[in-house]
Each structure stands twice: as structure tokens, then as C-alpha cells.
A protein has these predicted regions:
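Beta-strand-rich domains and repeat architectures in extracellular enzymes and scaffolds
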Residues: 54-55
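N-terminal signal peptide c-region/cleavage motif recognized by signal peptidases
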Residues: 16-19
């Protein structure tokens, strides 16, 4: 009976360890999935992780946030906010975090409070640099304007993510 309980605990630990290991990239050991941005003005998106694979399309927006969903050697499988993606060489990606505004005329507040002074308004689709994030708000910088916006109005940051 005791041997069975010990075996059950060991199996549970192994399963938990295996599932934890799947949350990290096999190449970089960074969290998976994770957000990055497009470093280059253009980035070829390929069907597979090599130069021999066909280019399906080209990302053409520098600083566009992308979500890394897989790693293979020097290649990262990414997707954009519309779910489109493929394999991109890691040299075209940056760890600098950006987000896309998902709400038209999004107000940036001076503090993470809807009653705070309004600093600016951003149109839908604007790319902003991501700063610190609390439980509900993130600090953004876009076109020289700074302020706080609610996380649910942004693509490129997880709702549970906290950044300092």
C-alpha cells in the first residue's frame, strides 16, 4: 500500500515536471509562448524552419508584436494578432516589447486610473512600446506620448503578465 502511494507521488511529480518543461523553449529556455517584436522593416515568413522552405508572406511593419509559439535552431514560429504566421529567422526578432492598440481612440491616462488626467488618444492599430504592467494596466509610449492603458485593449501582452 505504501509502495503504491510512493509510486503515485513519483508519477505525479514526473508529469508535473514534464508539463513544466513544455513551457520553455527547447533552444533558448525562454518562456513559451512569449511575445517579441519584428526588428527589421521586412521579415520573410516561411512555411518551415529553413531557407529552403517557401516564403508564404512578408511582415512589413517594424516593431510589430509577434507571439513565439515554437523554436527550432535559429528559427522561431511566430503568429501575429490575426493568427497568421510561420517561421522567421531569429535575427529578425527583438526582445523589445511592443503592443498593438485594439480599441479605436484608446485613451492614455497619466496614472493607471480611469479618473486620471488624459495624456493622449491612440487610434486602433497603433504600435506602442510596452513599459511596466500591473495587474490591469500597462504603461505605453507611442509617437512621443506616454500613458497608461488597460491590458484588455492591447495585443502583445498577457492579461496575467506583470512587468517592472
Amino acid at each position: 500500500m505504501l509502495g503504491r502511494a510512493v509510486a503515485t507521488v513519483i508519477v505525479a511529480i514526473l508529469i508535473a515536471s514534464a508539463s513544466f518543461g513544455q513551457d520553455r523553449g527547447p533552444v533558448t529556455n525562454l518562456p513559451m509562448p512569449r511575445f517579441v517584436s519584428l526588428k527589421a522593416a521586412e521579415g520573410n515568413v516561411r512555411r518551415g524552419p529553413s531557407l529552403t522552405h517557401r516564403i508564404d508572406w512578408v511582415f512589413t511593419r517594424r516593431d510589430m508584436p509577434l507571439e513565439v509559439t515554437a523554436e527550432y535552431g535559429h528559427w522561431r514560429r511566430v503568429r501575429d494578432r490575426d493568427g497568421q504566421g510561420g517561421w522567421v529567422h531569429y535575427s529578425l526578432l527583438s526582445g523589445v516589447r511592443t503592443v498593438i492598440v485594439e480599441r479605436d481612440m484608446l485613451t492614455l491616462f497619466a496614472q493607471p486610473d480611469p479618473k486620471a488626467r488624459e495624456n493622449a488618444q491612440l487610434e486602433m492599430g497603433v504600435i506602442a512600446r510596452l513599459g511596466e504592467c500591473g495587474p490591469e494596466w500597462c504603461r505605453l509610449t507611442a509617437d512621443g506620448q506616454r500613458g497608461w492603458a488597460r491590458k484588455e485593449t492591447l495585443w502583445g501582452v498577457n492579461l496575467e503578465e506583470i512587468r517592472e
